[in-house]
Amino acid sequence: MPKILLCCAAGMSTSMVVQKMEKAAKVQGIEVEIKAVGIEEFNDEIAHYDCCLLGPQIKYKLADFQPLAQQLNKPISVINSMDYGMMNGEKILNDSLKLIHA
């Protein structure tokens, strides 16, 4: 089962994206575990997930988070701002699964 970590400033807006992603996964018959956290939780959580997606509002943190993600062999990326703004859970889910299987 893929495990996806979403990270934003406080974990609030990404928690809504998580709900949309879980709904999309259910429709597609995919079992996933998705969690939203704030930036202060990234270091403690990344090791337990297959990939991490950052909210577009914290894309500036990508350079800070990449070294640990690479050390742990965890892909990390920034969510497309249009998909994030539209809460396109299906697209974000599919992008995260591609990231895991790349």
Task: Show the residue positions of the predicted features.
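Conserved active-site segments centered on acidic
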Residues: 2-39
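P-loop/Walker A phosphate-binding loop and immediately adjacent motor/lid segment at beta-alpha junctions
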Residues: 2-5, 9-11, 62-83
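Ser/Thr/Gly-rich flexible loops in soluble cytosolic domains mediating phosphotransfer, phosphorylation
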Residues: 3, 75-102
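Short, well-ordered alpha-helices that flank and scaffold nucleotide-derived cofactor binding pockets
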Residues: 19, 23, 67, 94, ...
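Short acidic active-site motifs
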Residues: 38-42, 61
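Generic structural signal for helix capping and beta-alpha/helix-loop junctions
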Residues: 42-44, 86
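Short acidic/histidine-rich motifs immediately flanking catalytic phosphotransfer sites
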Residues: 46-51
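Short glycine-/small-residue-rich Rossmann-like dinucleotide-binding loops
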Residues: 56-57
